């Protein structure tokens, strides 16, 4: 591998890292603006009820799937009616950003 290829890979890796950091920052803002903190806590680790899950540090792929399932209606247990209403106003891109943020806590 020559120097040029090495530099290209480095630039791409840096871009991905910066993109994920920006996505996580956006996720923090979305977590607040979409009112997630009202039930899951400001730190996503102190829910307001004993049936509300802690979200901090959860696996990103798991979070994405659960949020998509709430949005589509595939998940219909517990607080699913409330979550379905909230998720109706959350885009696929926002789901990704919120999941990135929560998984990094």
Task: Outline where the language-model segments fall.
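Electrostatic cytochrome c docking/interface patches
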Residues: 15-32, 46-47, 51
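Sequence context surrounding c-type heme c attachment/ligation sites in exported
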Residues: 25-37, 56, 60-65
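The canonical Cys-X-X-Cys-His
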Residues: 35-42, 98
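Axial heme c-ligation environment in periplasmic c-type cytochrome domains
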Residues: 48-56, 71-105
């Amino acid at each position: 591998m020559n120097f040029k290829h090495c530099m290209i890979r480095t630039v791409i890796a840096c871009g991905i890292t910066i993109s994920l950091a920006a996505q996580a920052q956006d996720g923090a803002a979305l977590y607040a603006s979409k009112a997630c903190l009202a039930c899951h806590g400001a730190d996503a680790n102190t829910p307001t009820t004993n049936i509300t899950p802690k979200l901090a540090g959860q696996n990103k792929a798991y979070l994405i799937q659960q949020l998509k399932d709430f949005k589509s209606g595939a998940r219909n247990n517990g607080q699913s009616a409330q979550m379905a209403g909230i998720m109706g106003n959350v885009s696929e891109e926002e789901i990704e950003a919120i999941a990135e943020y929560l998984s990094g806590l």
